[in-house]
């Protein structure tokens, strides 16, 4: 199947509800589902006890200024953070079966977890389980079948979270971090384990990007969750941050059905929290990936600065280039990203993050691939403030 065709089907599967914990039928109905042993450190991508911790690698960045000059931004993890972060990665596996195995691929789970989550180690202990997610090929094989599944992706995430609680939490506050399929699984986890239950008192926040958290119009709770509210400020603890990103010049709407930001009915709306400025427009503190290993359908790495080629750090910052605001057009509620390009200076005038089909931007996806990295610095700062608010309440 051509890349353009599987991306089309992938999008249709998302629209049909794929990212929810309900997944696809697997031809193993007569077999008992064997539980993953989360006492085995090899079943964690990120874990304080894992010597091969994916989140333990260097996440230093090169700052590319508006004049094209560059400077190094070093990074260190907090050796004794007061809270924990539990992360569930998005749909990324290219394993050929419907469900991913427990052997993470470098170009899929490993790089995704590294780019989306490792930087949080500056504010929290990092836990990221390997789980048997629905794979990208699995979406294609089962795009028309959303019933009679064994929900192993959700079962794995719930078991990993409960293992963390029983063996590592010790009453500490925690942040849940997810994207896309990971977000949908965390939505189910919050509903089943946290919302309105004693464990809610330990929730510092939940960052649920790249999928829909729904509330009644004008409300902060009562849709996806009965009691866990949406965040209304950067320093608020015990709440949910959620958003999906689109370019300002390619907004959702018009022809075609866009994948993110649309509420299920006219009485509700999808959450949009702007990490750059919850009250309006603000500058995105992006940590853009400078890792050259990409799959087809993603634009090549830009030349960050023609005046300083050869940047080698895993991340690049472009201060002043990117800003964002939440837009609600009555149908879609989304995070609009603007680029302050200046063709006269040597710095890049664009970023990569769109899904490409046959070399053209596939508009319904928006900037889904970089939802997290676009606001990474903002999110880490917010978690730091939320941790302080949590400790002081």
Question: Locations of the language-model features?
Answer:
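Active-site-proximal beta-strand/loop segments in catalytic clefts of secreted hydrolases
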Residues: 88-91, 130-134, 179-180, 208-212, ...
